[in-house]
Every structure is written in C-alpha cells, then in structure tokens.
C-alpha cells in the first residue's frame, strides 16, 4: 500500500499508510475468516485487507538455526479504493530488513522479488501485485525469504488454504 499511496498522494499518503498499517496490525474488526486467512474492514477511509500469519518460521545465522525476537510476521493483500489501491501485496517480517536486499516470495515454481522499507516489503508495481495474486490463488503455500539488518536469514511459510475465498470477500467489501 505504501507504494500506491505514496505515488498518488505524496506525504499525506505516507501518513495514511502508517495509519493503515497500524490498523492492519491492531484492528479487531475481523469480518470473516477463510481457513488460514482473515478478512478485515475499516471505514473512514474505507479499507479492506486479508492477512495470514506463517505456519512455519526458520531463523538462521551463519548457517545455524538461532532463536531471535521478531514482532508480528504477516502477509497482506490490501484494498484502499479511495486511493486506487486494488489488491496490493505486502509482507512484514517483524524486524527491519537489510536495506537494498530484496525479499523473495516463492509460490510453487514462481519467485518474485519484493522490495523492503523498514519492516515491510512490497512488489515493485501493481502489475507484479496482479501476477502474485494470480500465483497465490493457484498455490498451496507461499515462502518468504529475507535478511534482517543484523544478518539473520529468515524463511516464513504461509498456507494458502482459504486465500482465494478471503481475497474475493475483501474485493466484494471494498468495491
């Protein structure tokens, strides 16, 4: 959402994004649940999103598993109709990503790069969002690999059970 909002609304959008991100992490307005995905809706401005947490997480440093502190790890698809945001994909790894190091998203045999900013990462364009959503609808799981600013390699696996139904519900609620 940051990418789309920043392009359409400048600085005001950055504030709006921060607010939407905060709502995405703290909202209790769950309107539906589709297996491993939850659907949220907020008003003023109207925004809808689906979110899932990982089913498996692996943290490695120096080739060895390590225990690390991470905040919420979530995969999102967001709709913000007032800003023209229609199905923007994003990921938060629960830590600051290593700057200028792409985050990889693999669904089946398809891999996409996502670009980090702080604790969040997004695809490079709305066209890539569309490709990713299409892959997510066909897939069984999504694997996100990233590197923290401290050098920890993380691998987070998300189930895609319920993704298509949750996405359809969010689209319907945020036309």
PLM segments and residue spans:
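Positively charged n-region of N-terminal signal peptides that target proteins for export
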Residues: 1-4
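Bacterial N-terminal signal peptides
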Residues: 8-19
């Amino acid at each position: 959402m940051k990418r789309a909002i920043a392009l359409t609304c400048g600085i005001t959008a950055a504030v709006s994004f921060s607010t939407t991100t905060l709502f995405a992490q703290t909202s209790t307005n769950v309107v539906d649940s589709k297996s491993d995905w939850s659907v949220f809706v907020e008003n003023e401005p109207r925004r809808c999103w689906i979110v899932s947490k990982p089913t498996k997480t692996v943290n490695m440093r120096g080739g060895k598993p390590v225990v690390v502190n991470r905040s919420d790890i979530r995969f999102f698809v967001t709709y913000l109709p007032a800003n023209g945001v229609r199905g923007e994909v994003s990921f938060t790894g629960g830590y600051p990503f290593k700057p200028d190091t792409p985050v990889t998203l693999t669904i089946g045999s398809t891999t996409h790069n996502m670009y980090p900013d702080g604790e969040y990462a997004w695809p490079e364009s709305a066209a890539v969002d569309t490709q990713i959503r299409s892959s997510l609808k066909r897939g069984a799981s999504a694997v996100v690999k990233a590197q923290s600013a401290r050098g920890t390699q993380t691998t987070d696996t998300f189930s895609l059970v319920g993704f298509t139904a949750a996405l359809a519900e969010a689209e319907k609620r945020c036309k």
